[in-house]
Swiss-Prot record:
The organism's taxonomic lineage, starting at the top: Viruses, Varidnaviria, Bamfordvirae, Nucleocytoviricota, Pokkesviricetes
Keywords from the named record: Early protein, Host cell membrane, Host membrane, Membrane, Transmembrane, Transmembrane helix, Virion
Originating organism: African swine fever virus (isolate Pig/Kenya/KEN-50/1950)
Cystines in this chain: none
Membrane topology, as annotated: Single-pass membrane protein
Transmembrane segments: 8-28
Protein name per the record: Inner membrane protein p22
Length: 174
């Protein structure tokens, strides 16, 4: 009987030592990971990092979109995008309009003396408007085209040749 008690107490001590080792390793590992830097714009982050959902990240543009725009659905043919200060920029992409989606179509024809491109005019329209602008799309050439300003937060992106689509970064609908 005495032999069984010693074995149980030995197992109990071994279990306690094992739990202490696991706790020390966990705390050491957690201490080694640098805290995520809080940001509002890309300039707040280090080289090669971008501000995604309020923290600096080295995610690719497509991965950042998937993290920032949780409800966005993307066509598998969309293989890249790029960061701009206020938007995720896609080329050869269009927003698929399903039932219930809303947008405003604006014909853009800059005057000859205008210093801004048609795409810059679309971007400014989206930024100047309310927070309801969830993205914009431009199709046309440099002289004449159409700007669709989206006001519904649930977009589905499909591959379409010669379309340019921008989704706001760090937006309230993310």
């Amino acid at each position: 009987m005495l032999h069984i008690k010693m074995t149980i107490s030995t197992l109990l001590i071994a279990l306690i030592v094992l739990l202490i080792i696991i706790l020390v390793v966990f705390l050491y590992h957690k201490k080694q990971q640098p805290p995520k830097k809080v940001c509002k714009v890309d300039k707040d982050c280090g080289s090669g990092e971008h501000c995604v959902r309020g923290t600096c990240s080295s995610l690719s543009c497509l991965d950042a979109v998937k993290m920032d725009k949780r409800d966005v659905k993307m066509d598998s043919k969309i293989s890249s995008c790029k960061f701009t200060p206020n938007f995720y920029h896609f080329t050869d992409t269009a927003a698929e309009q399903e039932f219930g989606k809303t947008w405003h179509s604006i014909k853009i024809t800059p005057s000859p003396g205008e210093s801004h491109t048609s795409q810059e005019i679309c971007e400014r329209y989206c930024l100047w408007g309310t927070d309801d602008c969830t993205g914009w799309e431009y199709f046309g050439d440099e002289k004449d085209g159409t700007c669709n300003v989206y006001t519904n937060p649930y977009l589905a992106l499909k591959y379409t040749k010669d379309h340019v689509l921008y989704l706001p970064r760090n937006h309230k609908y993310a």
